[in-house]
Amino acid sequence: MNERVLRVLDFKSVTEMLKGQAETALGKERAKITKPLSSLDKINMLQDETDEAAKIIRLNQAIPLGGITDIRASVKRSSIGGILSTDECLDVANTLYGSRNVKNTIENMEELDIPILKELVEHITPIRELEQAIKSCIDDHGHIMDGASSQLRSIRSSIRTLESRIREKLENYTRSNSKMLSDAIITIRNDRYVLPVKQEYRGAIGGIVHDQSASGQTLFMEPKAVVDINNSLHESKSKEQLEIERILKDLSNQVASYEQDLLENVKVLTNIDFIYARGKLAQAMKASRPKMNDEGYMKMQQARHPMIPIDEVVANDIEFGREYTSIVITGPNTGGKTVTLKLVGLCTLMAQSGLQVPALDGCEMPVFDEVFADIGDEQSIEQNLSTFSSHMTNIVDIMKKITDRSLVLFDELGSGTDPQEGAALAMAILDEVISKQARVIATTHYPELKAYGYNREQVVNASVEFNVETLKPTYRLLIGVPGRSNAFDISTRLGLERATIERAKSLIGVDSKSVENMIASLEKSHLEAEQDYEQAHDVLLESEKLRNALEHEWNLFEQKKEKLYKKAEEKAEKAIQKAREEAETIVSEMRQMKDSAGLKEHEWIEARKMLDEAKPNLTKNGNQKQVDPKPVEDRQLQPGDEIKLLTVNQMGEVLERVSDKEYLVQVGIMKVKVKRKDLELIRKPKKKQVDPVTTIKGSNYHVSTELDLRGERYEDAILRLEKYVDDVLLAGYPKASIIHGKGTGALRKGVQEFVGRHPRIKGARPGESGEGGSGVTVIQLG
């Protein structure tokens, strides 16, 4: 895209707004050099990125970009052996933390469909070891900490001891020789502790003079008693500086070893901040994503000039590129024609830069190889040209470059010369541009061009509405209606005599009168059409409102139905839970039998399987499967009768009558109390001895040796873990693995606390490298 059009349309103002939305220096730098592209695929990719950022903002979420700085120069300097300062090292650590934070935040936005951003953060490499190495040596204020090395800790301990000894001796001087001192304080000169001694007591104190006051009355002396200690202190501070340099050298070498990863992280973070800034700008402008095309078709509803405040700007509908490829906006000067011209140009540049445009949803924007604009008189002064020559020089250059993939914007085409010649020249230029199949919008105040729009199929007239009552333009664009001067109406409103107005009208040609009357009629028809449209729009809104109300009622019905299903499911689950609770005591007995009486393992597992098979089968809607209940009379049921338990569709046998409405029946190995209405008599077999059975609390027959708790809430995870440990104990496994992930460590800590207090868990250890490392805890069962 040519630089001149970016300057003429003031595209820099847009990039400055974008720069203001970026949060890092890296993002601001990238925003500043934003340029329009001409590849449809690349533009669509940019629009996809912007749309993902806008989606995050719409859902009140955010990407945290705090603490991220431009560390590229520091990283490159470390790679050639340079020693970084403490602040530079701290910037590296903070940027590493910021990159890790950005990566985790975007990866955890599981409910959002943001594939581009999620793919981007896959290229961020967290370097915890380097981050921690720097943070363990340098505090948040950029100071090397004592714990940076054992040597530094020892040196600083020695320094503190020596400083204490020096202060103690000098404080003795201040107490015993206060009359010899200008002030009873201890100060420092040339990195040596000294006392402010009066000139006349120089010999009495004795020592080395390091400085004197401006008047010469006070000497800053180092008493002989502290010279040796000061020497030792100076030596220790030199050692301290050498050790600090060694530590910084070591940290710089570590930074250099991760050069490629760090530079890649910075590159990704820059792009993410740039994308996020585009999303925030879209929100600030109340913009929407344009559907891009390479057909030269533009359609914007309620489009707004991006540089005019939202509460002041007038929105307009603009569409061209199919039925007509050119728009000629006619009418008087100062009517807002140039604003419309720049609006189209700026929105085009924004869309091709991956920015959303300030218009309603559903807008469509074409992709142009070039946008050309002849607006204003920017060349005339600096090149000492007339207005006409300035415009024509630029137009000649444009005419040489335009193609069928160009957008051309002419402001006051043909102005600055004789009106008749200027109008003819304007029409000839438009014919040439249209013949090259370029898209063009031109503004003019020449009345001759009004007829031009009617005589060309590919051209449509337009005007900017003028309010005769207020004598001000409304800035509303009227497509299909050419502009008129309104001179007579304005003069009448301003008080010009009626006779003078009529005399003026009589002096203009018949053709001009006809054209003006036609335009007035068109304006009236256009206004009536708009009113009809608004009425139809109101009816449509009312219909949509009614439809929404019906949808709401339907949703309420669906919710009520779902609640009924849930109640049925809860009722069924309560029945299951009751049976399980009755089995709990027997489970305990069977555990004792297994430990003491040697219950066979296959019998134990078979019993558990049978109990699970007895669980009522629920459909996905939450209600029980339908059965055909056939209640039987009391006289039909006797101990030993073969029956069907209707609630679970299982065969069983009556053991005894508990009450008028309840029986004890055996289903498989399970004995349960069942209401009479839930039983169906099958037949009365021969009497047989019923072996005693035991019920147990069921679990799935196949119990996995691993339990994956990643992504679970803490409370839910512990409940699942408790049940799982019971299951693997019942299955007789010697060990099992609990997968909790590394994360923040909260879940891992909870798992370890549970394992530590469980009486049947003999021990636990972290997983080995092949087992998942610290993200897994392996438990030993007994």
Swiss-Prot record:
CDD domains tied to this protein: ABC_MutS2
A GO biological-process term: mismatch repair
Key words, A-Z: ATP-binding, DNA-binding, Endonuclease, Hydrolase, Nuclease, Nucleotide-binding, RNA-binding, rRNA-binding
Chain sites annotated for binding ATP: G331, P332, N333, T334, G335, G336, K337, T338
One matching Pfam family: MSSS
GO molecular function, one term: ATP-dependent DNA damage sensor activity
UniProt-listed Gene3D superfamilies: 1.10.1420.10, 3.30.1370.110, P-loop containing nucleotide triphosphate hydrolases
Family, similarity comment: Belongs to the DNA mismatch repair MutS family. MutS2 subfamily.
PANTHER family: OS10G0509000 PROTEIN, OS10G0509000 PROTEIN-RELATED
Protein name: Endonuclease MutS2
